[in-house]
């Protein structure tokens, strides 16, 4: 299970270094093989390959009215491997889709990661905090 936030930098070739605390888990769980695709909120999702296979099956089973979402998730997916330095290459198309330039945030979301443009993530987080808790969390005890 992946959790936590990491402020990272894309290099000139679009590579992102996976934090050390997650590399071993990705090697054990997926032999360093991951899949990156678009997220409807404007970020990217990075899945260990076995988790991607489960997600892909769920997406493929969606009804015809979700056909465009199948295209968005499956048609945009890029299979990549961690290199010997623990980096993953984010394709130019995916960097453009998520407006990733240099500074990014990697968020552990349990079974996968989200990759955000750092400024976009900060703005969306501040907006969410300003709106207050959604009804689904009103009775949640902290």
Curated annotation (Swiss-Prot):
Write out the annotated subcellular location: Cytoplasm, Nucleoid
Main localization of the protein described in the UniProt heading:
cytoplasm
Query: In the UniProt record, which is one GO cellular component term?
Result: nucleoid
Which part of the chain is the SpoVT-AbrB domain? 5-51, 77-120
UniProt keywords (A-Z) are: Cytoplasm, DNA-binding, Repeat, Transcription, Transcription regulation
Q: Which SUPFAM superfamilies match?
A: AbrB/MazE/MraZ-like
Pfam families xref list:
MraZ
**Top-level taxon of origin:** Bacteria
**InterPro entries of this UniProt entry?**
MraZ (IPR003444), MraZ_C (IPR035644), MraZ_dom (IPR020603), MraZ_N (IPR035642), MraZ_sf (IPR038619), SpoVT-AbrB_dom (IPR007159), SpoVT-AbrB_sf (IPR037914)
Subunit structure, as described in the record: Forms oligomers.
The cross-references to HAMAP family, in alphabetical order and at most eight, read: MraZ
Q: Which NCBIfam families match?
A: division/cell wall cluster transcriptional repressor MraZ (TIGR00242)
PANTHER family, alphabetized: TRANSCRIPTIONAL REGULATOR MRAZ
Q: Which family does it belong to?
A: Belongs to the MraZ family.
Q: What is this protein called?
A: Transcriptional regulator MraZ
Organism of provenance: Ralstonia nicotianae (strain ATCC BAA-1114 / GMI1000)
Q: Which gene encodes it?
A: mraZ
């Amino acid at each position: 299970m992946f959790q936590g936030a990491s402020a990272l930098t894309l290099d000139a070739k679009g590579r992102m270094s996976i934090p050390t605390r997650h590399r071993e888990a990705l090697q054990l769980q997926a032999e360093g093989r991951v899949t990156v695709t678009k997220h409807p909120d404007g970020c990217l999702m990075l899945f260990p390959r076995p988790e991607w296979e489960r997600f892909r099956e769920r997406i493929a089973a969606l009804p015809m009215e979700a056909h465009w979402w199948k295209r968005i998730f499956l048609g945009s997916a890029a299979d990549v491997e961690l290199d010997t330095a623990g980096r993953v290459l984010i394709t130019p198309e995916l960097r453009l889709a998520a407006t990733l330039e240099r500074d990014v945030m990697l968020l552990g979301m349990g079974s996968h990661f989200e990759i955000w443009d750092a400024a976009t993530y900060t703005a969306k987080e501040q907006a969410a905090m300003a709106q207050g808790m959604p009804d689904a969390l009103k009775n949640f005890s902290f």
